[in-house]
Amino acid sequence: MATQIIDDTPKTKGRRSGIGNILKPLNSEYGKVAPGWGTTPLMGIAMGLFAVFLVIILELYNSSVLLDGVSVSW
């Protein structure tokens, strides 16, 4: 029995729009990944600083034990 190949590509090109033409360059790098670690260390540092920020905010909100010596008068 022979295998039948069906072409699934659309026969029409679709409509072009001004917005599509503007946004097309933003999608040109889709799927490409730079080799190596890239900006991963910077993201790790940013996440660490954000975690410290959240801990400070939580301690201020809860008047934590670590801030017993600091007087806060709202």
UniProtKB/Swiss-Prot annotation:
Phosphorylation is a light-dependent reaction catalyzed by a membrane-bound kinase; phosphorylation occurs on Thr residue(s) in the N-terminus of the protein. GO terms for molecular function: phosphate ion binding. Gene3D superfamilies: Photosystem II reaction center protein H (1.20.5.880). Its main location: plastid. It comes from the Eukaryota. It is a single-pass membrane protein. Keywords: Chloroplast, Membrane, Phosphoprotein, Photosynthesis, Photosystem II, Plastid, Thylakoid, Transmembrane, Transmembrane helix. InterPro entries: PSII_PsbH, PSII_PsbH_sf. GO terms for biological process: photosynthesis; protein stabilization. It is found in: Plastid, Chloroplast thylakoid membrane. The modification Phosphothreonine is found at T3. Belongs to the PsbH family. NCBIfam families: PRK02624.1. PANTHER family: PHOTOSYSTEM II REACTION CENTER PROTEIN H. One of the components of the core complex of photosystem II (PSII), required for its stability and/or assembly. PSII is a light-driven water:plastoquinone oxidoreductase that uses light energy to abstract electrons from H(2)O, generating O(2) and a proton gradient subsequently used for ATP formation. It consists of a core antenna complex that captures photons, and an electron transfer chain that converts photonic excitation into a charge separation. PSII is composed of 1 copy each of membrane proteins PsbA, PsbB, PsbC, PsbD, PsbE, PsbF, PsbH, PsbI, PsbJ, PsbK, PsbL, PsbM, PsbT, PsbX, PsbY, PsbZ, Psb30/Ycf12, at least 3 peripheral proteins of the oxygen-evolving complex and a large number of cofactors. It forms dimeric complexes. This is Photosystem II reaction center protein H. It comes from Anthoceros angustus (Hornwort).
